[in-house]
């Protein structure tokens, strides 16, 4: 395939989908810009705080992107570029965009509360508690994984005698110091924009220049060399503070400025791909079973592996937690929901297509196992194309910028996940129609923002230090189960309020089938592992039990959801 043509056609389809299907959704759902959003009606200067659309887009996009739209498409490339492209385009427009837009819209019509509260309203209190328990535990796993990724990106390398290997650690130390300076700059940005009313445009220009300055300083001055455990503790302290700090101080400005790293990364990628316009060796279709297994472990059958592996970039349950958790509390106007949620999803799809071009350009290195880490594949492929156009001298600079950008989004995602977990932890104890202010005794104490955050951070960091990777294989299915349940929740709510919800039927049931099939395969693999015995048998039991519990949870919530849809239909018929 020609990478430039592949990218241009894919992006054109996404633009058409945004204009026509996204516009149709907004019309059918009744987006009303005259209605005040929770950011205004419940403004508290902490969690509820209206943000200008570009700023909120920066937060939302930085939070949902992370490394997902890079890792997933590159790993799924073993099935060929045609299946990946079709799932990214169809999934993004008709699954992920609908899911993200719907979750945000439902939340702003529920006082900015999470998708769990929406489930409580339209399905029932039992369903709410089940969903929030599942979502909270999934977020703990996300915190553990992303904190670990950040710590690994920052950590020093040591020689055999225990001394710091400064040459080998320089790149990580640079990333760490750049990230620290970036956080400090974001705080200053937030102060001047929100407390000194500095013009956003001028402040943005200064902020982008500041990013470049931070990178130049960090690449030449990196005095901090710490091990993995110390960095995990530091990251834990950071996300703990960040998740309880008013959003205007850090979350909004940092995510907004971080988004320019991502936009810059995507611009570099497009310039490299279009300028180089390579014909790559990546096959269109390799078959319905992964026989390449470049990482050493086969993904198995294309169904369900393709639809679980490519989550961010097609449809991801984590997005519904972000949209209904932090984004809905900052949405200035209802009309902003479409570009931020639906548009943000499709931009992520474009990033997924760029990732396919990157792996395609170095396909032989990937297929033979020479270069298999998705982030390295992404940076190597794009930097190689860029340097082919502008000369080999720019390879190292572009490569470092791409690695830094991916690291920045992992840090963004981990503190957003911590804040979301804090919200959901408190919502679990609040009864329908009540607020946290109505709680008394130990429930009021444990749902205090600082206490809830402390519990979340300790659990996440502890899991990150003790081996989250042992259960990480379940995250793909768990994340897509979140997506199926998010689609179910919004579908039930739209039915309850008398709006068109038929666009949710197929995506909802398809994702449920994908999830259950994936979980059945996982459970089967754990049973085989248990029968074989050996050192890893304990973790086989753990993964198997978690898989069975997820299947039971999915079936229970879907049954309750179908009953709710039936009740809504009867109520609508009675009203007629």
Model-assigned labels for residue ranges:
Residues 23-49, 72-75, 85, 89, ...:
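Flexible loop linkers connecting adjacent transmembrane helices
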Residues 49-110, 121-125, 142, 147-158, ...:
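Membrane-interface helix-loop-helix modules in multi-pass membrane proteins
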Residues 125-140, 343-350, 393-398, 427-465:
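Loop-to-transmembrane helix boundary motifs in multi-pass membrane proteins
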């Amino acid at each position: 395939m020609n990478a430039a043509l592949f990218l241009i056609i894919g992006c054109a389809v996404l633009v058409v989908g945004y204009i026509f299907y996204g516009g149709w959704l907004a019309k059918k759902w009744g987006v009303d810009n005259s209605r005040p959003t929770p950011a205004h009606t419940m403004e508290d200067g902490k969690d509820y705080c209206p943000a200008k659309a570009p700023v909120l887009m920066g937060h939302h996009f930085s939070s949902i992107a992370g490394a997902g739209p890079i890792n997933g498409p590159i790993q799924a490339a073993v099935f060929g570029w045609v299946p990946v492209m079709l799932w990214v385009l169809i999934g993004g427009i008709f699954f992920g965009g609908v899911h993200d837009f719907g979750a945000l819209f439902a939340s702003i019509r529920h006082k900015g509360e999470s998708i769990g509260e929406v489930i409580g309203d339209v399905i029932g209190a039992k369903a709410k508690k089940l969903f929030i328990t599942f979502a909270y535990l999934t977020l703990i796993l996300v915190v553990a994984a992303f904190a670990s990724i950040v710590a690994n990106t920052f950590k020093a390398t040591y020689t055999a005698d225990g001394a710091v290997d400064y040459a080998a650690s320089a790149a990580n130390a640079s990333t760490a110091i750049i990230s620290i300076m970036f956080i400090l700059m974001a705080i200053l940005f937030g102060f001047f924009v929100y407390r000194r009313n500095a013009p956003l445009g001028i402040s943005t220009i200064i902020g982008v220049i500041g990013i470049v300055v931070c990178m130049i300083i960090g690449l030449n001055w990196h005095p901090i060399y710490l091990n993995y455990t110390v960095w995990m503790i530091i990251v834990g302290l950071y996300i703990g503070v960040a998740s309880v700090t008013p959003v205007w101080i850090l979350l909004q400005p940092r995510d907004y400025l971080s988004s320019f790293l991502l936009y810059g990364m995507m611009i570099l990628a497009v310039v490299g791909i279009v300028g180089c316009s390579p014909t790559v060796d990546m096959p269109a279709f390799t078959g319905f079973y992964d026989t390449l297994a470049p990482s050493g472990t086969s993904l198995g059958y294309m169904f369900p592996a393709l639809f679980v592996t490519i989550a961010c970039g097609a449809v991801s349950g984590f997005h519904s937690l972000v949209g209904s958790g932090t984004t809905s509390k900052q949405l200035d106007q209802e009309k902003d929901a479409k570009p931020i949620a639906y548009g943000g999803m499709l931009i992520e799809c474009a990033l997924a297509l760029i990732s396919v071009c990157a792996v395609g350009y170095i396909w032989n290195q990937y297929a033979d196992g020479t270069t298999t880490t998705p982030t390295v594949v992404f940076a190597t492929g794009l930097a190689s194309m860029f340097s082919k156009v502008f000369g080999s001298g720019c390879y190292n600079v572009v490569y470092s910028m791409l690695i830094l950008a991916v690291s920045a989004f992992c840090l963004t995602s981990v503190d957003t996940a911590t804040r979301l977990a804090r919200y959901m932890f408190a919502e679990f104890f609040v009864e329908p129609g009540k607020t946290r202010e109505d709680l008394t005794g130990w429930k009021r104490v444990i749902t205090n923002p600082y206490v809830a955050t402390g519990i979340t951070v300790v659990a996440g960091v502890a899991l990150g230090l003790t081996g989250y990777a042992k259960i990480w294989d379940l995250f793909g299915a768990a994340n897509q189960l979140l997506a199926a349940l998010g689609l179910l929740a919004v579908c039930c709510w739209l039915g309850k309020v008398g709006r068109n919800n038929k666009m949710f039927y197929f995506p909802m049931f398809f994702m449920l089938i994908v999830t259950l099939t994936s979980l059945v395969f996982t459970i089967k693999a754990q049973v085989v592992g248990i029968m074989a015995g050996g050192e890893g048998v304990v973790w086989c039991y753990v993964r198997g039990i978690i898989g069975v519990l997820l299947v039971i949870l999915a079936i229970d919530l879907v049954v309750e959801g179908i009953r709710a849809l039936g009740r809504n239909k009867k109520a609508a018929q009675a009203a007629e």
